[in-house]
Each structure stands twice: as structure tokens, then as C-alpha cells.
Amino acid sequence: MGNNQGKTLKIGSYHLNFVKQIAEGGFSYVFLVKDSNTSKHYALKRILIRDEDELKGVKHEISIMKRLTKHKNIVKILDYHKVSDKNNTEMFILMEYCSGGHLVEIMQKRLSSGSKFTDQEILKIFQDICESVAYMHSQQPLIIHRDLKVENVLLDEESGIYKLCDFGSATEEITRMKNKTEMQNAEDDISRHTTLQYRAPEIVDFYRSPVINEKIDIWALGCLLYKLLFYVTPFEDSGSLGILNSNYTIPPNHTHSNDLISLIKIMLNPDPINRPNIFEITNQLNLLRNQQPLFPSHKSNILLSYNENNNINNNNNNINNNNNNNIVNGKNIPKPLPKVVSQTTPTPTPPPPAPSQSPSPSPSPTVVNNIENNSNGLEHSNSNGNISQPSPTPPKRRATPGTTPSLQPVSFPPNNSNNSFDDPFRDSPRTNLSNNPFNVNSNDNSNSSNNNNNNNNNNNNNNNNNGNNITNEEILNIITQLTNNDQTNTFDSGLLLKLKSMKPGKGTMHIIVKRPLKEPLVCFKSLLLVHALLSEGNNIQFKSDVHDSKDLFNNLYLGWSKQKDRYLQLGELLSHYSLLLYKFILFHQKNYMIDGSFAFEEMKWGIPESLDSNNHPISINTIKALFDIMDHLFLVQNNLSDYCINNICSSNSSGSGNVPISLLQHCVNILNSSSYSIFCFISGSIDVLSKQFSDVDMKLISCVNQFQSMYTRLREQYTKLAQVPCFSDIFFPTLPNTAPTFTIVRSNSFNRLNSSLSDLNLNNNNNNNNNSNNSNNSNNSNSGNLSGNASLNSSFDNINSSNPFSTEPTFNPFSATTTNTSESGFGNFGLSEPTSNPSPRYQQSNNNNNNNNNNNGTPISLTPGSLSPVIGAKKPPLPPNIHHLQQQQHPQQQQQQQQQQQQQQQQQQQQQQQQQQQHPQQQGLRFPHSASLEDARLYTLILTPSSSPPLSPSTGPTTAAQQQQQQQQSQHTFDNFNINGHAPPVPQSTQPSFQPHVSFAPNVNINNNNNSHVSAPHSLNSSSSSISSISNPNLGGIAQKGSGNSLMPPPLYKPAARGHRRSQSSNGDEVRRRNLLQQQLEQNRDFLNHNRLLNKQSRMNNPNNLFDEGDSGFGDGEEEDEGLLN
């Protein structure tokens, strides 16, 4: 945008001259401008607006700034101006100019010079920021900034005041989530308007709190203060997991004040209720700077009460615990304030009571967070790598009314994944379950007493143990009820929801392992419970726990495989279901960033660096792993349907394995949810990869083809299960009518791509032939006939499909078979390389040996030439290299077609020569070149002595039909038009002596009920353009592109925008469509009769008429006419 230098702009009373560009964003730029009247400098923000939503957001930002412009610590807005034209809309916002620049730039300069901020400087900067936030929170309604960070703070060098800027993320709404839809909307909004490193736990895991309020700004201020002190954010390395567990490191040997460290820990409280408000923080900063509290009605010294609570905690500890090794071995991490020795910088105000320097204080039962645990434990963790620090995600408040389980002095496995600040699944080797698997005290208090290193702390935590024992007993009771052997007591959804709300973590699998899993009903319920918990969001602790017990599911798979002879279908179902969960566990262990519900969080993950990135959720490797899971999920669904059909539906009982129907229905619901979520995840991944990487990789094309096949199988599985009487009342996910398509741009490596595509196309054709031959022999051949050419074509579709449900079929389900044409009765007209796509309905009809009956009761075989044409389907041509590859696959057919073309050309030449000899004076009476396609069609129907056209494309030579399709695609003017292009050559004895000039009647508008189809351009009469008959199936096709009522052959090209919805239609749809066409033909009778009468009158009034009734195309005889109209 440097070309704006020297330009001028008038906004209100300001005459601005562009000086230079000082900042740049995604769709915005900030310029330094100078007012020519006052010579003052201002900042001008230029925002490019792409749609109405962005315009609404910019207007909202301007309204927020206008409300806040009076405060000294907020950048003032002076004026704004909107500029719009036909192509672009821009908004200019004029603001005051802060010459000191951004705070982050100042920090970088200070860091490079080696002179970091002192504590007094940090207090000044942080106080200015907090006062601006306090002003926002004091508004009615209050304003939440939501994007507080050092990058959004500016310095005014003249006044030395730091000012807050960038209010594009600000909101006036407090979000209250009541259901999953509102939760998903809130998550999308947060991902667009916040920065991950500054997000609070409640906006990382939305299940923590149903309310999102101004306390997220307090957490962001804690992260900002941390960065002012240590020049990094507290969760720079640990990411989302560190935020959820409040795991951050206080660097050892720091030189900052203990008050600043305590202030960080107060603001980084994982419980938003226990965080102070902005007014209390501002008052505390005033005290630290020897100033009067700015908000007297609020607390003025939150550090004092905070330190007093910690002193009480320290006094309640046993003085005998003065050995750090005992504490480390007992896994009881103390939680005092960080030790501040001689390095501590004195504050201007009298310091609060110093915390006890005892190395072994125990946690207080009144503290409801683990922040202190993090700070102190982190100091030790840098010096001693053997310390294991538990930091599980705090459960929901309603599930744990007492204290947080993370404060309990219990024993933890030495390799507990939550002890480190890295991702919990990074260390693959796991140990077996310990005797006390929970991260809280178990129901039996003797288990905790077995931990010899914690004996000194048991007496100080009895209150906490009692509250946690209640929670553990409740979890144990719920799991026992859900996995009992009572056939009447089915899977209670209420108990399951209650268990999910408790966020079960370590130790859950310890309870499930002790269940009698050799009983089929207990095992089935246990597998359902694990699957339900595994699919619930991103419960890191449970994923770690279930991964520790992954061998259980492998053993169940092997064990139930051996019991197939005894339990038949039930044993097979349990075996495959166990293996499916085993695959799920391994997948989540490797792809820990993907939650159990397979939510596609592109904004959170970012764009991958390569197609097969190992550490990114969006990659070819992840897609292939999900394909493997889906294959096994299909197998489990087949087992379910077979079991229900053979055991329950046939005997109206509970089956040989005594599995209740309600339990099977619950299993179907879980499998449906998982399969549909994986389908959407794969669709989104392929769409991102196809847009991000322009170079076509065969791995991506292979994934596209697998996805097409998976879509077909998934659709068939849903249909199959829905037909089972036991599952007839279950809701099944709604899939798009056709598989999503993706845009893949070919790069310069064209030769490599062509060779790869040739192999791929041959493989697809072979797969189609094998599937069609074996469809009656196998019930699992679900990859089907729709996955071959359709998937290959979709790989090069020009349709942008960011939404997996925004597109329609990428192929024409009723197109004709493959032919190669060069010239036909239409002359050199249209494209020279039509594409081909075999109709999936035709393949299905051949596989199932289905026949349709015509009006006379005669069975009509659905051959490629006799299929009904597509109505309204538009299909663009395939790339030239695809045509070339397809032409090479059928050399024999190509030779036959060439011979047919030569014969037709010879016949046409003979006809033209005879006409020239008989009527040389009438050679100029052919159809005018400027006429439209529709006029030419009607001209052909009226003047051509041909048999009546059928409802379906011709079963004879298809070259004429394809040439006619080329005409409609190219929309050229007529060149050497042959009126006999539709039909086989007419014998010489029946040919007319010459073709007279005919004047057409005005357009006749006939009511057409088929309003869903778009009429073709240059159409005379869309309702009069379709004439159907079944009596003569030897003529060409009658479906014109873009119109359901025309006499052109079916389109052979892929749709450019939206395709056809009839790929899944039945024979009943075909009959209804034919009846509709027949009705339209009857309506056209008057139009054709009218034109025939005009022809007769013109011949009677013309004394030089050279026609006789015997040679006329439409004489007095009505046989041909009746055949044409009926």
C-alpha cells in the first residue's frame, strides 16, 4: 500500500495527506497521515469490507470506540468515512496518533538492549492498562475487550501514557450457553476474536462454565502481566493443556517483586468466580504505587487477604514436614507464594505480611484452585525432573461442591502424564494401573494410608477426603449401575449425563476393568460407556486413563473372537466393537489435539505446512487413519444389523445374547454420531488441503477417491440400518445428496499428473467392473459403482466447496455411455471431445436386473441409450487429458464409431447431392444461421418426415446425439445445419424434393408446472420443447442442457454449479417424470398443428409451389403426425 504516499483524503473537516504506512493486518492497513490545516499527525485505519457481516462488525467497533473515546488510556476516535463502489467497500477510521508505537515493539527494543522493564515501570504500564479496562467494565452495559495483549497497547510519547487500542473483538454481551448449539456458536465466536495464549480456561473448554463474562479479561491481564515480567506468555509451550490445568512456570532466580508474582497468581485462577474483578486489581495497583484507590467501594488490598490465607495454611501444616524429599516422594506439592529472598525489589508501600518460608506447608481445604500448587511446584520442577505434579482439569462445580480433587495428598503413578507441562499423550509407554488409580482418594481410606510418604499429611486433609470420597462413591455407583447384568435396567441416559458432568479421569478404567466383562451384556454396556465418554469433548484425563488400559480392548477382541461359535452374531459384534474402540484409543493417543467429538477446529490448529505433516491434525496421515476407523465402523454396523435381523426381529425377543433392544438402539446412535463426525472432519480436511496446496499430489487424489467411496458406503449403511425394524424410530444423520467435491488446481508437473491419473482411471474402471459383477454375491460391496468416475471427476471440479454440503452431484447420473465423435449430421458443430460418465442408475439396474414397463406393458431394459435424460443437470467438460485417457481405453469401440461416422457422412453427402440436382433454386432455403437452437429444433420437428422421438436417448449410433449435445454446449450459430441430424437417414423415396422457407408463428406460452427447472437461453417456448413417446425408441435423445422440456440429448458434461438431485431416485420417479413429459407433449399438440396449418396455407397461396402432398413432410395423412404427437 505504499502507493498511497502523497495522496489526499477528506474526512469531515480533516484534509489528510498520506505520509506512510505504519501497520498492516489481514484486511486492514494503518497509515500515518497529516492534516494540511493544522499540520497535526493522525493514524488512519483503512479496512477492506467484503460482506455485510464485516460491515456490521466495523460499525460495532466504531460504536464501541465512540463510547470509550473520553478516557485518557484509550485511543480516541476522531472521525470515520465509508467509501463504496461497484467492486469494493472500504471504511476509513481516523484516530489519534501515538508516536511511541506498540508496547511489544518497545519490549523488543528493551530486550535487545539488555535493559528490561523495572518493577516500577511495569506497575505504571499495567496500571494504565487496568484503568482502561476498568472504564470498559464500568459501562452500562459493560464492554468486554476479549483481546487484551501487549500488541494492542500503544504509547503516547508526549504524555507518557499507555493507551489501549483495537476494539474489533469487544462485545457487550455476556454469553450464557444452554445447549450444544449455543456452545458451538460461542466457540466459533471466541476462536475469531481471541488469541489462544491469552484465553481463559472457560473459553478453551466450554463445558467448564455455562457463562462467559468479563472475567476472561482478568485472565488475559494475568497473562499480559506475566509477559511484561518475563517477555513470554505463561502458556507459550504448554498451550491449551497448560491453560486448562493452569500449569505455568515461574522462572527461578527472577528479580521481580513478590507482589507482582502474587498478583499474577491471583488473576490466573482457573475458577472465574475466584478471580478478582478489575476494580480490585486497579485499587491494588494504586496502593503499590502509593496512590489513593480509584474505586473506594471495592477492595483495596487483595494481596493482603491472599497472603493471610496462605499464612493460615502454613500455620496449619505439621512443622515436622521440613524435608522436601518426603514431600516429593508423597507427591504432595506445597502451595505457598514463591520464595522471595534478597532479590526481591521493595515496593513503595509497606509490604504485606510475608509468607512463611517453611518448605513444607500443606494446602488449605478452603482454597478451591490449584494455582499455588502450580507456582511452587513449577519452581521445583525446573531443578528436579523427578517431581510429578498433578494438575488435572478441575471438575464442574455442580459435580464437586467441595474442594478440588487436585489438592489431595494421594499417590500418583510415577509416569503420570499430567505431571509434565507437555501434552499428556506425548510419552507413549505407559505403566499398569496403580492400586489407587484416582487422582483423588478412593472410597477405601486404607488405600491412601498405604502411601507411606503421605502419612504425615493424612490428618490435615480429612475434610477434603470426605468430600472427595463422596464424589468417588458416586462415580463408582453410576458406573456399576450403567454396566450391570440386569436386562431390565438398560443404559440410563440421565446417569450417563451425570457421569459426563463429573469429568471422570484417572481411575475410571480401574472400575470398569473390575466388572465381569465375560458376561456379554456387561461387556456390551462397558464398551458403550467407554465409547460415550471417549466421544465427549476433550477429556484429557480420561483419554490418558483409557490409553493405559488399551490392552484390555485388544484382549476383549481376541477373547470374543474365540466365542463366536458359542454366541454367534453377538460374539462377532462384541469382538469387532472392542477392536473399534482400540483403534479409537490409538488414534486419540497420536492425534491428541483432536477431541473425541472430532470437531474440526481449523482456526485453532492453523494451516498445515505439508500434506503429510505428522504433528498437525489436518494431514493425509490423519485422513488415512480415519478411513481405517470408518472401515471397521462399517463392519460393526453390519454386525448390529445382522444380529438384530437374525435374533431379535425374527423371534421378537431379546436375542440369544440377551441384549435389550434399547441398548442396541443406543449403540446405533453412538455409531451414527461418530461416523457422521468423522465424515465431516475428513471433508473439511480435504477441503483445506486442496485449497492450501496447489501442487496436485496423488496422495490427495487417492484420499478424494476413498472419501467418495466412504460416502457411498456410509449412505448405504444408514439406509440399511434404518430398514431394520428395531431401528426404524432412530434418527439418522442427514447426508448430502451426493458426495462433496473439492477444487484441486493442477500445477506445472502436468506429465507426472497425467501418468498418475491414467493409472488411477484404469483402476477405477476395473473397480467398477468388479463391483458390478460381484454386487449380487456380497452384501458388503458398498464401495459401489458410484465411486469410480465420479470421484475422479470431482477431483478436478471447478466448484468451490468450503462447506461439505454446498454442492450437488459432480457427475450426470443419467448420461450416455462413452463415445468419441468428430463429425456427424450436424456438421462441424460443438466440441470435439465429449466426456463420458456411466449412469449409476443404469449400473444399479443391471446389477439388480430391474425392468421398467412402458405404457403398452412391454418391458423396457434400462440400457444406456434408453435411460431417461437428466432434467436441469449442467455438466462442464472434463479436462482434456481425461478425455484422452478415456479414448485410449476402448480402441475397438473407437474403430466402430469411426466406421459409423464415415457411413453417416457418405449418406449425408448423397442426400445433399440429390437435393441440389432436383431443386437447385431452393438451395438457399436452409435454416438461417442466426436462428437459436430452439428454433432449429422446432424447424426439424415440423419439416422432417421422421418417426416420433422417444422418451429416452437412442439405442442406435450415438454420434448424432453427441454432436447435438456439442451444439447446445457451444451455443454457436448454425453451420451446414442438417435437419435430419436427429434421426436415421430417410430412404430416398420418402425424402422431400426440397426444403422450403418457413415463417414461424409468434411464441406460444403454455403453462408449465415444472417450475423447478431453468429454461435454456434463446428458447422459443420452454413448455413446448419436449415431445415424448415410447412407441419408437430408435431416435436420438431429447433432453437439452438447462431445460427439462427440450428435444436435445442428455448432457454429457459435468455441472458447473449445482448438479442433479436424482442420483438416488427410484423407478417411481422415472415413471412420474415420463408422465410429466407426456402431459407437456399433449400441450404442444396445438402448437404443432398451428405450424402445420401455416405451412399448408403458404403452399396453397403460393402459385409456384413445387410441393405435392405426397412429397411434403406433413401432408394430409395423419399417421406420421399421430406418431409424432402421441
From Swiss-Prot:
One of its GO terms (cellular component) is cytoplasm. Residues 367-390, 796-825, 833-845, 857-866, 1095-1105 have a biased composition (Polar residues). Residues 314-469, 760-901, 944-1072, 1095-1126 are annotated as: Disordered. Residues 16-295 form the Protein kinase domain. Pfam families: ANTH, Pkinase. It is an enzyme of class 2 (transferase). Residues 1108-1126 have a biased composition (Acidic residues). This is Probable serine/threonine-protein kinase DDB_G0280111. It catalyses: L-seryl-[protein] + ATP = O-phospho-L-seryl-[protein] + ADP + H(+); L-threonyl-[protein] + ATP = O-phospho-L-threonyl-[protein] + ADP + H(+). Residues 347-364 have a biased composition (Pro residues). Its EC number is 2.7.11.1. Belongs to the protein kinase superfamily. Ser/Thr protein kinase family. One of its GO terms (molecular function) is protein serine kinase activity. PANTHER family: SERINE/THREONINE PROTEIN KINASE (PTHR22967), SERINE_THREONINE-PROTEIN KINASE DDB_G0280111-RELATED (PTHR22967:SF91). The lineage of its organism: Eukaryota, Amoebozoa, Evosea, Eumycetozoa, Dictyostelia.
